Every structure is written in C-alpha cells, then in structure tokens.
Amino acid sequence: MTERFDCHHCNESLYGKKYILKEENPHCVACFEELYANTCEECGTPIGCDCKDLSYKDRHWHEGCFHCSRCGSSLVDKPFAAKEEQLLCTDCYSNEYSSKCQECKKTIMPGTRKMEYKGSSWHETCFTCQRCQQPIGTKSFIPKENQNFCVPCYEKQYALQCVQCKKPITTGGVTYRDQPWHRECFVCTACKKQLSGQRFTARDEFPYCLTCFCDLYAKKCAGCTNPISGLGGTKYISFEERQWHNDCFNCKKCSLSLVGRGFLTERDDILCPDCGKDI
C-alpha cells in the first residue's frame, strides 16, 4: 500500500503536484498562499509563490505594484524615498519635498550632503565664503549683511584692528577714547594688569589702574602719608601746598577733627584753637 502524501492543511493528495514545505510540513500552493503569503500593499491580494515579493519596512508589494505613488513609474531596482507612508521616485520626491539650494537654486537630492543655516539650505559645495569663494564646510564662519565669510576673510575685510597690537578684534573688545582694543591688550600702563571691567583713570591719555596711579601721581596725605586719590568722591583738605584725607585732618594734640573748624599751625602741625592757646 502506497504511503499517503497529503497537504498538511486541506489533506489533498500532493502526488504529482507542486507543493511547499512550511516548518517541515507540506502544503499545496493554494493553502500555502492562503495561510502564509504576504498581502500586497498596493492591490491588496496575496503575493503568490510564482511572484517576486518586494518588501520595505515590513510592507510587501508585487513587483508590478511597486511603483511611485505620484507618477506611477516602477521603483524596482531604483532609488526611492518614503513620505507619509507613500513611496516616491527621487524626481517626484525632490519636486515636492526636497529643499532648494539657496545659491544655485537646484534641488538638494535625498542623501546629498547639505548645509543648513537660519532655515535655508545649500549644497555643501555651494556654501562658500563670499570673499575667497572656498567651501566653508564645517569650519567657523561669520554672517555679514546676508553674506557668509570664513573667519580669515572676515577679519581682513571687516574686523576692527586693536590700536595696541594691530591685530583684528574678532570678539568682544573694548573702546577707549574712541579707539578699539582687545580686552587683553587694554592694560595698565605701569603694571600691565588688564583694565577691562575694572575702575581706572588716565594721565596724558595713558590708562592706569587706581593703585598704580595713586602710587605714581597722587598727592600724599600730610597725616598718614598714604596717597590721596581724589577718585570715587574721596574728600580731602588742602592748605599751603599740603593735603590731608578728611579723616586725617585732626588736631595734633587732642586728635579732634578740624574739618569745617578753625585751626592753628605750629611748624608742620595743625592744632585746634583750644590746644593752640598755649602757643
């Protein structure tokens, strides 16, 4: 007696017929397609065993159904793009969705390297310095009046030059007497300490920190011998070519403050009227 060889699903004999194994179980073609064949995204019918099954992201198409959703051209063996679940040939995708190069106005094709800045796009080779025309690529650049410049060209054409070192000022900087300086170049004439953000004064148009200015040029208090800066509202008394801090203008004997009072002098000393009675 001949051993039976039937379809695992419908039990029809498979002798002399085409069949397909699924998990080592034989199936007739009809049962296999009904149970296991993928459904075409386009026409909604099963993709039979005698058809090529084209897939993209777990979706399947008959070879004849795999075409552009806009123009209908076949996408078999051609590059394509997906947009909102629809497949598009590169021409249709570019016409509808690809950005245009700000410089040459041509489409920037999918997969092409591009540069983006402030909502505009360029081909990588079109994003160039306005002055030297070299591609900027990933290098730093500076925008100026709707034009882009590489840093060296911008410095040559637009940057202010520091009055001290004569080099371009690219960021920050300070202005003193209507002249531009690098922050690191604007220093005290005496000690070379940076003055940016600090209180300073000047003599003969040269800037000085307060400490150096007082040490070099300020009058000395006749009482404590420390400099009288005269800056920041500092009050002092001047008498016969001598100066005192307000706090130092006191009677030599009793230390009474003489600010706003009468006083007497005894050689280099100043005295209140009471202490000066015995003179």
Curated annotation (Swiss-Prot):
Disulfide linkage: none
Reported tissue expression: Expressed in heart only (at protein level).
UniProt keyword Metal-binding present: yes
GO terms under cellular component: M band; nucleus; Z disc
Boundaries of every LIM zinc-binding domain copy: 40-92, 101-153, 162-212, 221-275
Positions in coiled-coil regions: none
Phosphoserine found at: 238
Matches recorded under InterPro entries: LIM_FHL1/2/3/5_N (IPR056807), Znf_LIM (IPR001781)
Pfam families (UniProt xref): LIM (PF00412), LIM_FHL2-3_N (PF25076)
Cross-link (Glycyl lysine isopeptide (Lys-Gly) (interchain with G-Cter in SUMO2)): 78, 167, 220
SUPFAM superfamilies: Glucocorticoid receptor-like (DNA-binding domain)
Coarse class of the protein's main subcellular location: cytoplasm
Compartments in which it is found: Cytoplasm; Nucleus; Cytoplasm, Myofibril, Sarcomere, Z line
Known function: May function as a molecular transmitter linking various signaling pathways to transcriptional regulation. Negatively regulates the transcriptional repressor E4F1 and may function in cell growth. Inhibits the transcriptional activity of FOXO1 and its apoptotic function by enhancing the interaction of FOXO1 with SIRT1 and FOXO1 deacetylation. Negatively regulates the calcineurin/NFAT signaling pathway in cardiomyocytes.
Binding partners and assembly: Interacts with ZNF638 and TTN/titin. Interacts with E4F1. Interacts with GRB7. Interacts with SIRT1 and FOXO1. Interacts with CEFIP and calcineurin. Interacts with FOXK1.
Domain remarks: The third LIM zinc-binding mediates interaction with E4F1.
Name under which the protein is recorded: Four and a half LIM domains protein 2
Protein species of origin: Rattus norvegicus
Gene, per the UniProt record: Fhl2
